Design a protein with these regions (language model features):
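Short amphipathic, basic-aromatic surface patches that mediate peripheral association
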Residues: 69-86
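Aromatic (Trp/Tyr/Phe) and Gly/Pro-enriched flexible surface segments
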Residues: 1-66, 88-176
Length: 176
């Protein structure tokens, strides 16, 4: 249960141990996450990064990405063996949005290329996550930075997808 910045509901994302089964599979933690897109559960064990399909079509040019968050770190980052990674560093969450172009070869981005794909047109990466006191919310307000020209014709044809990602652990996709 959690409170909300506004209204009655809020998403609470928590990184948890996956227990013995997850550890045996090399996936000792599961980071709580919320994203726009789909998840292919049938391929999650064999290809966890490929199972997450980020983004949905967008018919407008995004300018800003803003909202509110509250964050309490889960502690120090651990590796797939459950031991702290050296040098020791504190876990931190992620908040970002990616606008990318779809084409005949790229219908979606996944966990392996969400921040590296050549199809990325613009990014809004919030890098200022800080731990809060546990009450109250912090504002994030990020301007989209365009890396490629925006094409209104592609917009009309819904050739742009928008991915929005919130993750409790920055390296959660890699089970760290």
């Amino acid at each position: 249960p959690t409170d909300a910045y506004q209204g009655k509901l809020a998403a609470q994302l928590v990184t948890r141990s996956t227990g013995k089964w997850g550890a045996l599979a090399g996936m000792p933690i599961a980071a709580g996450n919320l994203f726009i897109g789909t998840f292919d559960g049938s391929s999650a064990m064999a290809d966890p990064l490929g199972a997450t399909h980020f983004g949905l079509p967008l018919g407008q040019k995004p300018v800003r990405f803003l909202g509110h968050y509250r964050y309490i770190s889960g502690g120090n980052v651990t590796g797939k063996d459950g031991k702290e990674i050296i040098p020791v560093r504190r876990d931190i969450g992620q908040i970002y949005a990616i606008l990318y172009e779809t084409d005949d070869n790229v219908q979606y981005l996944d966990g392996s290329n969400i921040t590296t794909s050549p199809n990325i047109v613009a990014r809004a990466m919030f890098t200022g996550i800080k731990e809060t006191e546990g009450t109250g919310y912090e504002l994030f307000d990020v301007t989209f930075v365009y890396e490629k020209p925006y094409d209104p014709e592609k917009q009309k044809n819904f050739r742009y997808n928008l991915a929005v990602v919130f993750a409790a652990s920055e390296r959660g996709a890699y089970f760290e």
